[in-house]
Amino acid sequence: MYACARTTKINHFRGTSTTQNPNRGLEPSPSSYVTRRSKEKRPINVEKRSHKKRKIICPLEEEPIQTTPPEWLLNVMRREENGYNPKLISTRQLYKTDLKKTEARLSVPFKQVKTPDFLTEDETRIIHENAMKIRDNGVPVNFVDPELNKHVLELRKWKMKGNWIYVFVKGWKNVLDACKTLFKEDDVYPLWSFRSGTGKLCFALTPKNSGRGNSLPGGDGASTSGESGQVPLPIPPARYSSNSGQGCSGESSSSSS
């Protein structure tokens, strides 16, 4: 009996030497099941995703860009002492801020400039010095509006929201007054630059219907909408020396005498 009790005691100590999991035999809780399921990767439908195309947003333009100078512009250039070297700067859409007199400027972001080499080295330096507050004024330019009125504006560059833009100031209010019945928000106007016969930097905001076959009042009246449909590019100033006395208002100098 003593031996039996001793054996029982030894077995008792041996049995208690092994530690058992107190949660053994319990069912997993619903929360642990959801957590485990959420970690599993969901299969990707490759075939469905392969058919998706990324939407590309293009800038709004009412019509294809006309890189050939319209006749309206060529006639304006002839009146600017036989202007030359036309360049398309931007297809400019008018926004509400452009039409507000309190803003008093027309802006053209650098990213929208189609021909960036329209400035000379001196003009580039002057505009840069003005932007750096080294110089008070920018570059004075002649600006012809769609109604054929010529204005004297100033071209500068500003940095707005981290981006550089060209701005026409000091006279833009006069342009708004001259075209107050014409300019509408969201209208699109091609903005061109050219040089007058003396080399002065000029700009023209051409009207929408300034394409082939249109001539200006007071001009030579020639139409270039013939069989070829081509608009001639400006040629050296000496070719148009007979028209050098005309102004941008559409009236020749002879009519004022």
From Swiss-Prot:
This is Putative B3 domain-containing protein At2g27410. Gene3D superfamilies: DNA-binding pseudobarrel domain. Residues 8-35 have a biased composition (Polar residues). InterPro entries: At2g31720-like, DNA-bd_pseudobarrel_sf. The lineage of its organism: Eukaryota, Viridiplantae, Streptophyta, Embryophyta, Tracheophyta. Residues 5-50, 212-257 are annotated as: Disordered. Keywords: DNA-binding, Nucleus, Transcription, Transcription regulation. SUPFAM superfamilies: DNA-binding pseudobarrel domain. Pfam families: At2g31720-like (PF03754). PANTHER family: B3 DOMAIN PLANT PROTEIN-RELATED, DOMAIN PROTEIN, PUTATIVE (DUF313)-RELATED. Residues 115-209 bind DNA. It is found in: Nucleus.
